[in-house]
Amino acid sequence: MAGRDPRDRAPRVRNRAPAAVQITAEQLLREAQERQEPAIQAPKQRVQDLEELSEFQARKRTEFESRIRYSRDSILAWTKYAQWEASQNEYERSRSVFERALDVDPRSVDLWIKYTDMELKARNINHARNLFDRAITLLPRVDALWYKYVYLEELLLNVSGARQIFERWMQWEPNDKAWQSYIKLEERYNELDRASAIYERWIACRPIPKNWVTWAKFEEDRGQPDKAREVFQTALEFFGDEEEQVEKAQSVFAAFARMETRLKEFERARVIYKFALARLPRSKSASLYAQYTKFEKQHGDRAGVELTVLGKRRIQYEEELAYDPTNYDAWFSLARLEEDAYRADREDGEDVEPMRVREVYERAVANVPPALEKRYWRRYIYLWLQYAAFEEIDTKDYDRARDVYKAAVKLVPHKTFTFAKLWLAYAYFEIRRLDVSAARKVLGAGIGMCPKPKLFTGYIELEMRLREFDRVRTLYEKFLTYDPSLSSAWIQWTQVESAVEDFERVRAIFELAVQQSLDMPEIVWKAYIDFEAGEGERERARNLYERLLERTSHVKVWISYALMEIATLGGGEDEDGNEIEGEAGDADLARQVFERGYKDLRAKGEKEDRAVLLESWKSFEQEHGDEETLAKVEDMLPTTRKRWRKAEDGSGELEEYWDLVFPDDEREANPTSFKFFQAAQAWAQQRAGQGEEGGLSYDLPSDSEDENEDGDEDGDGREEEGMDQD
């Protein structure tokens, strides 16, 4: 590398800008083609006389002999040599070369074909026949030689000779294409009986469904339907009635039915379809079912179409279940499908057995969920319930339905979770069988094994329907011993006692309830107060409100307390239907409650609750008060004022908010400025009344009329929420 001349290196390109004239690949190719020198052509030789011809032939033979001497196994060299001799009309020499080549490779199909082609070109027919005879004797499994031999004889109109060649060929039991060629030969010359005999020999050699169908189609096309039926019947007898054999012969059944359809024999076709489908499993007969469905839609009645659609849907569901056996939706669909089919057959007057439906249900419930989690079992347990309902309603097999319920109860892992719907369905089944004691035993076992609120509720509802109030009380005692925090259970118990007019027991139950740690204590207190108010016991209701206010001082409790004081309690109708006037309320007591509530909320600094209370108080005064009391409440209503405070995100920035300003708070905090503020506000209202512009820029109007409606709605909607401060 050190002695390399630097001048040999390629020059460095300094200007990388594109050239003004661009050269394309097309120009390069065109220029290369123009500059290409002409190829050397061999001189043409013209033979002038026989001497020169003999010299030329001798030279070419020498070349060919030299070539095959060095490449003796090259069939191409031998073929070229023989064909050149044939081109010189030296057929004897050409045959000699071909024979020498056959000595080298007698099994070369290409060599035999070119040898026969040479003889045929020279119109040496007998030589060609002899060659074909030698070839098929030596190579009987090469179809090309047979085809060429047959074609030669038929071309020469030697049909009998062609038939003899086919007969020799058929002795070797060739493939189906050879048999079909033989049959087509006979058809071309209208030898249909011979063709039918060939079909029979072909079937004996290769009895596959396709060949049977082809034979039957041939007989049908030549106007022999009875013969075609005989062919199909022979085929079906050959394949047999076993499942595997019928599956193999599906195409034969389908072709047989299609032929009968073409011949307008619809009942025959229907019988053929049903015969095959009855012996095949649903998963293996999808195509046959599809053809049967199409047949029924075209030529069947409504019942037949429904039956075929039923079978098609069966196959679809079976395929889904084969992929996922725990697909309970597919099991439900399949079970409903079988139930509908069973009911339809029974309505048609057929004597059907429910074995197919039971088989589906048994297979379905055998697929137990893999995990002990209730979310996996929810759909599964409905299979058992639907199974039991089918046995009870459709088959009237009550003992079997009871066994289904028992098996389901035994299967569920009750220590982990249970299903109240299962226990209740089992119990109501026993009720329908008029066995009340058995139903009680079932529900008792369920409560003893796995108590849950829904199970208690269902058992209590059953006893209520039976009017067994002592049992209902016992059940409620067990229910609340199991879970004393259920507010709804306490209320339901009091409703039961109210229905039997045992009011002292109702009060005792409520007293027990309010002493418990309830999940929703506000609804229990409200129910207790509503009960006393409904009985006209205002003093008892007042005591309950006082006890409730000791626990919570929510604004809704105060509002409800005040409205109770003004409401009319008691009343109703006596035994004769005469109306009884209730005890009227006292507006002064209601105002006292409002005042107490306002003071309590003011002491706690609850501005929003105070505003809600004042709005309710204002509505009360508008309905039950006079102008003086209403004006007093309106003077207590707050106004809105825009103020600023530090942001809660800790950034130190100020944020704007609207604050409620109560007159009594301002009066106590700034008595002097409050008087000035009142005078300024009165002056602003006076000017507004005269139609002049002006006002206080720092004090916005309170919009008390709009807030009236909003406050009332809020007050009513938050009534129960206020009692949740227990």
Swiss-Prot record:
Where primarily located? nucleus
> In terms of domain of life, where is this protein from?
Eukaryota
Keywords on record:
mRNA processing, mRNA splicing, Nucleus, Repeat, Spliceosome
Q: Enumerate composition-biased segments (Acidic residues).
A: 702-726
| Gene Ontology cellular component list | post-mRNA release spliceosomal complex; Prp19 complex; U2-type catalytic step 2 spliceosome
Task: Cite the Pfam families for this sequence.
Answer: HAT_Syf1_CNRKL1_C, HAT_Syf1_CNRKL1_N
Q: What is this protein for, i.e. what is its function? A: Involved in pre-mRNA splicing and cell cycle progression. Required for the spliceosome assembly and initiation of the DNA replication.
Known PANTHER family for this protein?
CROOKED NECK-LIKE PROTEIN 1, PRE-MRNA SPLICING FACTOR
- Family of the protein in this entry: Belongs to the crooked-neck family.
Can you name this protein? Pre-mRNA-splicing factor CLF1
Organism of provenance: Cryptococcus neoformans var. neoformans serotype D (strain JEC21 / ATCC MYA-565)
